[in-house]
């Protein structure tokens, strides 16, 4: 039987605009605000909203620019964003709630629950044919899936590769099929590497969403509503924006040049990733990137993962979020960016083990992630701070604006101490 929401979540209340009132003073965020305004004035981003917490206290909330640049609609904190891969944190937390109930162990083979993923084949290094494989040396585990080390792919970021072609031909990402259909599409596709030996950003968290369905006996959207979104009061976080709220959905833009993120110019692209996205129901509850949300809702989620009050997960589970789950010597890697040395992955997001030149020096130990359109969150346990920043531009996950904001936010908190 599915457990009822815990006392921890039941005590958390509803995420409202009242929750976005600054409750601790003495922090100077004017440099961060001015920097974000420059991105808007430079026609690099239409609008940016942000919030920063020290402990559980909000020390800054800010909105600059437009929800709809063409209509000159000012961006407000209650505007709704396509959060894409920010969805992954909610999906990972959903699975970890079941883990806390003893429904599975992290190193359980996934075929215990999803038999179609047993007996995997793995592409040989340099393979140019889909059948150029070798047997997997071990099963995919739930830990591998939560940390993107299972050998799965997205079939998005490596055009021309054999796995890119296969994922697209099998329509692995097809929103017109349910999560069970995605599993069927993956069933006879090879892995890109031996489970547990590397990192590749992938549909692994969508597999986790299906795992939640199988274990709970509920559709994924119903589970997260009853166990996370409802208890946390995340009233605007869902897979489809209701018609009455569609006026609050911010416009979606593409930059002038994918390879030059600082080239001015924005083009409307509201029909991405497909016409009607987020406006009408589809069979796929995309646990890796299908939700919309708001600044208050995302702050409520992040606050629920911080010490000092009721938490969504137990303290020992929260500690797992900041434990590196990748093999020794394995770092994050993306097809268009290469290896990100010093960046690893936990059970809910990326980890900064060694800050890079574009990170603040105080960010060591930070857990973070974000969506492809520029919605990001981070938690810095060593600095007792956290933050959320939201924009809506294609391929803005690694846009300079977010790195600059985080550096300035860290500095504002540091200078106040």
Locations of regions flagged by a protein language model:
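Generic C-terminus detector
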Residues: 393-417
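Short, surface-exposed loop or secondary-structure junction motifs
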Residues: 120-361
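Short, conserved catalytic-motif segment at the N-terminal edge
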Residues: 22-83, 103-105, 122-127, 131, ...
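Active-site SXXK
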Residues: 30-37, 56-58, 82-110, 205-213, ...
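Short, well-ordered beta-strand elements
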Residues: 62, 372, 376-378, 383-393
